[in-house]
Amino acid sequence: MNVLQTKLPGVLILEPQVFGDGRGYFLETWSNTRYEDAGIAGPFVQDNVAFSRKGVLRGLHLQHPRSQGKLVQVLSGEVFDVAVDVRVGSPSFGRWVGNCLSEANHRQMYIPPGLAHGYCVLSETALFSYKCTDFYNPATEIGILWNDPQLNIDWLIAAPVVSPKDAVYPRLAEIPAERLPRFGDV
């Protein structure tokens, strides 16, 4: 497995080894020892799968308290996956990193606890899978406006399809600091 660092500390791109031939391919998507050696701490307690159509944008989401680390991958199709550092006191607060994940490149992205996450679908459809280090808890859910001008995320699509809930989230600057995770605490 190849592990690539990103400009956000703790956010990793993982390229699993793929064993392929004329029949198809095989790859390992999780091995506790191998992934811990790469710097990904579990345990993972919940797996989710989301199906979306072209142009759908989901995010930006996080939980605090009970922040979730996420290991994400695309099973079919292609998405542009984004992580945003929203940890108060972090040297990279307000910065984001994005990467294309697809069934063709088999890449995974690890987003550590305390960062916001979102993605948009670039292919006709996409099947998106993610492992979480804590359970979904709607009482601690935080959303950040996907097109926050201060974040200035280039989503690679012109007119995304956004849920009514995601469309009315506040900008990062409008969220009280005490509501956000603190750098070093998660």
Cite the ranges covered by each PLM segment.
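Non-catalytic, conserved peripheral segments adjacent to functional cores
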Residues: 1-107, 123-125, 130-186
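Short beta-strand His + acidic residue motifs that chelate non-heme Fe in jelly-roll/DSBH
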Residues: 109, 117-122
